[in-house]
Regions:
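Short amphipathic alpha-helical boundary/capping segments
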Residues: 68-81
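Short amphipathic alpha helix immediately N-terminal
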Residues: 79-99
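Helix-turn-helix DNA-binding module
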Residues: 95-112
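DNA major-groove recognition helix of helix-turn-helix
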Residues: 120-127, 131
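Intrinsically disordered, low-complexity basic tails/linkers immediately adjacent to helix-turn-helix/homeobox/MYB/SANT
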Residues: 133-164, 433-434
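Extended alpha-helical scaffolding regions
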Residues: 158-222
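Electrostatic, structured charged patches in enzyme active sites and in nucleic-acid/phosphate-binding
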Residues: 193-434
């Protein structure tokens, strides 16, 4: 077996998104270094830390730096193997789109779900080996973030918080393995720790499935929980149409990498991709102000540079006052990404055509309108505005600007939204739009 094959086999043996990772997850559960009590605490702490990161954008540039290195590595691979490059980009969500399920990847490339996993695994093996042999990429961003000397618990907590904050649960295990390998952890260590990450994700994905959770595990929904969000809704004129009775998303609705929970309000099981989406569904299910809701109610078609794409907003909800809102889930800083702004424009148009309001729910205390109003130094904003007048800003130029100004990720997102700049990812490029 070649080194590439060993790398690919190790990557693949971290498991398949859910059920198929049972062996890796069970093995991880027997590891004496993380007890069941510590594992449960890790899941809770990661969720809380993820919410804090989603709210503040804390260390967001560090996560962007990681994706920038990955995008450069994938770009080199795509030059020789275009399909591999596209598959890795779609699986990890490097271009700002959400990570895709293996079922969806299989449909995209005309192969089975298992074959999509094999192709991804082979591609990652080739990419990691090439990066380690060439030494051309600065892998210190991984080594600094996931040091080899850290405890299992600390590494798992860090990875889970990042996954939750970036809404990337679908590819959480794959990202964990890849980040650890590039940080210098050996094959078996990376595989084992990725198994821990899978355990935690699978735990919150299946929490409350088929039945109501015990009262001590239910998340209380305050009576006024929806008040600030209803003020952020972009309302439509006219009478709202009825809610659909089934999800518009059908192709990968039952993919093993997705999560499920029982809804008391709907008296059935509901489905979601991420921890953030699960929080939204629980808020809808537990709020007395919400009469009914439907997950993935509509197919939204949008266009990115001539490429037609499809998106399914997280939910539509009818409130007790008769108003209806189409809701999408996007982490706060990510609302400024070009792909998400285009999706939001298309989603708003669709919602208003149905007489529904439109809301981007961020999982933080702030929404898009709050981000637009965020105060950033006028001097710093003018500095970036003047720099963009001379041409696009790439990652290297942005890093110099950040070092001289000290801005954080939410500052950048606020300036992008206010000035209608275009923020592309994978690789990063900031452009002034005429």
């Amino acid at each position: 077996m070649t080194s590439t094959e060993r790398e690919a086999a190790a990557s693949g043996s971290t498991g398949r998104d859910a059920g198929g990772t049972g062996r890796a997850a069970n093995a991880a559960g027997r590891d004496p270094r993380i007890s069941a009590r510590e594992a449960a605490a890790t899941g809770r702490d990661a969720s809380a830390a993820g919410r804090a990161n989603a709210a503040t954008g804390l260390d967001g540039f560090g996560l962007e730096a990681i994706d920038e290195v990955l995008a450069a590595m994938v770009g080199e691979q795509a030059a020789e193997r275009p399909r591999e490059g596209l598959l890795i980009t779609c699986r990890l969500g490097l271009d700002g789109e959400p990570p895709e399920t293996l079922t969806l990847l299989g449909a995209r490339f005309g192969v089975s779900r298992d074959r999509a996993r094999q192709l991804y695994t082979r591609g990652i093996g080739n990419m990691v080996r090439a990066a380690q042999l060439s030494g051309e990429h600065d892998l210190s961003v991984f080594a600094d973030r996931y040091p080899v000397g850290w405890s299992d618990e600390r590494l798992v907590r860090t990875l889970l918080a990042e996954i939750y904050a970036t809404d990337s649960d679908i590819a959480g295990q794959d990202r964990a393995y890849l980040h650890l390998r590039l940080a210098g952890h050996d094959l078996q260590e990376s595989k084992r720790l990725a198994g821990f990450v899978f355990q935690r994700i699978a735990g919150w994905q299946q929490k409350g499935r088929w039945h109501l959770m015990p009262p001590e595990h239910l998340e209380e929904v305050p009576a006024d929980a929806w008040n600030p969000w209803l003020h952020r809704v972009e309302w439509a004129a006219g009478d709202p149409r009825e809610l659909p009775t089934a999800p518009a998303r059908t192709l990968d609705l039952g993919d093993d990498g997705r999560g499920f929970m029982y809804s008391e309000k709907l008296a059935r099981e509901t489905t979601f991709d991420t921890g953030l989406q699960a929080r939204l569904l629980r808020l809808l299910d537990g709020s007395e102000r919400v009469e009914s809701f439907q997950e993935y109610p509509a197919e939204i078609v949008y266009d990115i540079d001539g490429s037609e794409r499809v998106h399914y907003p997280a939910a539509v909800a009818r409130f007790t006052d008769g108003r209806v809102v189409l809701i999408d889930v996007i982490p706060l800083a990510h609302t400024a990404f070009h792909v998400n702004r285009v999706k939001s424009t298309a989603g708003r148009a669709y919602a208003h055509a149905q007489g529904w309001g439109w809301l981007v729910w961020t999982g933080a205390d702030e929404g898009v309108t709050d981000l637009l109003a965020r105060k950033v130094s006028t001097r710093h904003e003018n500095q970036l505005r003047n720099r963009l007048a001379t041409g696009p800003v790439d990652w290297t130029a942005l890093r110099r600007y950040r070092e001289s100004t000290g801005i954080d990720l939410l500052d950048l997102a606020a300036m992008v939204l206010r000035n209608q700049w275009r923020w592309d990812r994978g690789p990063f490029l900031l452009t002034r739009v005429s």
